[in-house]
């Protein structure tokens, strides 16, 4: 074998056989460090979870290599036989899981799934309604910095000051005044049940389409731990990586066949090209997992754990926005402690408790500082925490916050060190990817 042939052989051997550590030590180190972070810290970000080994395996599968523009049976590329199998399974499982007639499993993200609905139903400048960001809504529901607020005319509804619940009478009055073409229910930081029947009643009154973005609660809906938006919503969207415990992606669900062509055309070719088939495969895996009886147990445990965490926080002197939670999440108002959400996020992270700063209703601080933090129980529940563990977590959070209230943003180093030790002990009892 010549030198050139040997060199080429060595190159090909590396290509086919080198693992990540050999091919890219820097990225391998970052992945290893991220795994250790997830193992050693308690994840309390409400929008995060821990996917199964099977979901990770599908996400990293050879479907990464496959282009599959179009839909099953109607592709623009050859060689899509097994891509069709994967996508058809994902569609059928999604329909079974959520009790609907149609599903599009191609959206690459939550933003793109909602953009596809806008593209299918609205023209630039059309009016739609969504929950105000300061009341727990999402960027894609009309924030002025998002395409939904730049290309369309968003009108917001919010929560009452006295009880921090959505005022359905205000929703109805706003809808009658502005006559939106689309009404969105669903949010990213609202911990109470949504009145889906009333939203549909209001939508029908003003001849609007009702979209439910159930990204945060879809796992709870799938597991019977939260009311379903069907049959009330015309269209339902959801990410798949939050309480549903799948890969990072999105789906669109509906019942009316008349919506099929505009929604499918909006996703492809309107918004996307080839779908991420490795992610579609992982979605199919996650849907199958969610169809199992043990997932129902998990979903109910998420809600039970959230209530235990909220109760513990209140018992330890922290106020929960709206007085509690009906789902997986809660907002903690730190105003009385004179602690910012930014400081709390940093202090809790030093204590190995991961959360995110979050605005509270009628917050006077900027979104980069905030007066609150958002907490959630999906990831902790996945690793095996029950109510007893979450009550301990609530007490640990309160200790750190009290240290911040006493000493300012630098916190109480001794308290944070003590909390780290107890977090480490908890995590060792409930390992991640052991």
UniProtKB/Swiss-Prot annotation:
Regions that span the bilayer: none
Site feature Plays an important role in substrate specificity, where: 241
Pathway: One-carbon metabolism; tetrahydrofolate interconversion; Amino-acid biosynthesis; glycine biosynthesis; glycine from L-serine: step 1/1
Modified residues (N6-(pyridoxal phosphate)lysine): 242
Its EC number(s): 2.1.2.1
Any GO BP annotation: tetrahydrofolate interconversion
Catalyzed reactions per annotation: (6R)-5,10-methylene-5,6,7,8-tetrahydrofolate + glycine + H2O = (6S)-5,6,7,8-tetrahydrofolate + L-serine
GO molecular function, one term: pyridoxal phosphate binding
Principal EC category: transferase
Cell compartment(s), UniProt: Cytoplasm
Cofactor(s) named in the record: pyridoxal 5'-phosphate
GO cellular component: cytosol
Ligand binding ((6S)-5,6,7,8-tetrahydrofolate): 133, 137-139, 366-368
Domain of life: Bacteria
Swiss-Prot/TrEMBL keywords: Amino-acid biosynthesis, Cytoplasm, One-carbon metabolism, Pyridoxal phosphate, Transferase
Task of the protein: Catalyzes the reversible interconversion of serine and glycine with tetrahydrofolate (THF) serving as the one-carbon carrier. This reaction serves as the major source of one-carbon groups required for the biosynthesis of purines, thymidylate, methionine, and other important biomolecules. Also exhibits THF-independent aldolase activity toward beta-hydroxyamino acids, producing glycine and aldehydes, via a retro-aldol mechanism.
Family to which this protein belongs: Belongs to the SHMT family.
Subunit text: Homodimer.
UniProt-recorded name of the protein: Serine hydroxymethyltransferase
Gene expressing this chain: glyA
């Amino acid at each position: 074998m010549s030198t050139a042939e040997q060199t080429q052989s060595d190159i090909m051997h590396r290509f086919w056989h080198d693992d990540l550590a050999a091919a890219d030590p820097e990225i391998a180190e970052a992945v290893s460090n991220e795994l250790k972070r997830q193992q050693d810290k308690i994840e309390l970000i409400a929008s995060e979870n821990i996917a199964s080994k099977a979901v990770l395996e599908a996400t990293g599968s050879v479907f990464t290599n496959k282009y599959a523009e179009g839909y099953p049976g109607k592709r623009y590329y050859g060689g899509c036989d097994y891509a069709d199998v994967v996508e058809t399974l994902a569609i059928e499982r999604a329909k079974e899981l959520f009790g609907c007639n149609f599903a599009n499993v191609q959206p690459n993200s939550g933003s793109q799934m909602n953009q596809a609905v806008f593209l299918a139903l609205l023209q630039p400048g059309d009016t739609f309604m969504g929950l105000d960001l300061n009341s727990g809504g999402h960027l894609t529901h009309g924030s002025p910095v998002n395409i939904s607020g730049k290309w369309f005319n968003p009108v917001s509804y919010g929560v009452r000051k006295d009880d921090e619940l959505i005022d359905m009478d205000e929703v109805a009055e706003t809808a009658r005044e502005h006559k939106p073409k689309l009404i969105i229910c669903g949010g990213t930081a609202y911990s109470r049940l949504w009145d889906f029947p009333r939203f549909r009643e209001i939508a029908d009154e003003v001849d609007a389409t009702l979209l439910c973005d159930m990204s945060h609660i879809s796992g709870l809906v799938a597991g019977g731990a939260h009311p379903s938006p069907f049959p009330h919503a015309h269209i339902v969207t959801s990410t798949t990586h939050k309480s549903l415990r799948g890969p990072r992606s999105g789906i669109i669900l509906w019942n009316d066949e008349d919506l099929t062509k505009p929604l499918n055309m909006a996703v492809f070719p309107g918004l996307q090209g080839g779908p991420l088939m490795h992610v579609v495969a992982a979605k199919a895996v996650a849907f199958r997992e969610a169809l199992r009886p043990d997932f129902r147990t998990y979903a109910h445990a998420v809600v039970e754990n959230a209530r235990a965490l909220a109760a513990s926080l209140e018992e330890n002197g922290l106020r929960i926005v709206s007085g509690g939670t009906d789902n997986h999440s809660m907002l903690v108002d730190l105003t009385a402690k004179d602690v910012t959400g930014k400081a709390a996020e940093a202090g809790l992270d030093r204590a190995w408790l991961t959360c995110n700063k979050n605005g509270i209703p009628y917050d006077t601080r900027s979104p980069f500082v905030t007066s609150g933090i958002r907490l959630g129980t999906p990831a902790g529940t996945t690793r095996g925490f029950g109510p007893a563990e979450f009550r301990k977590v609530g007490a640990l959070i309160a200790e750190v916050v009290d240290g911040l209230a006493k000493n300012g943003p630098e916190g109480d180093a001794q308290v944070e060190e003590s909390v780290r030790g107890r977090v480490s002990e908890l995590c060792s009892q409930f390992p991640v990817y052991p």
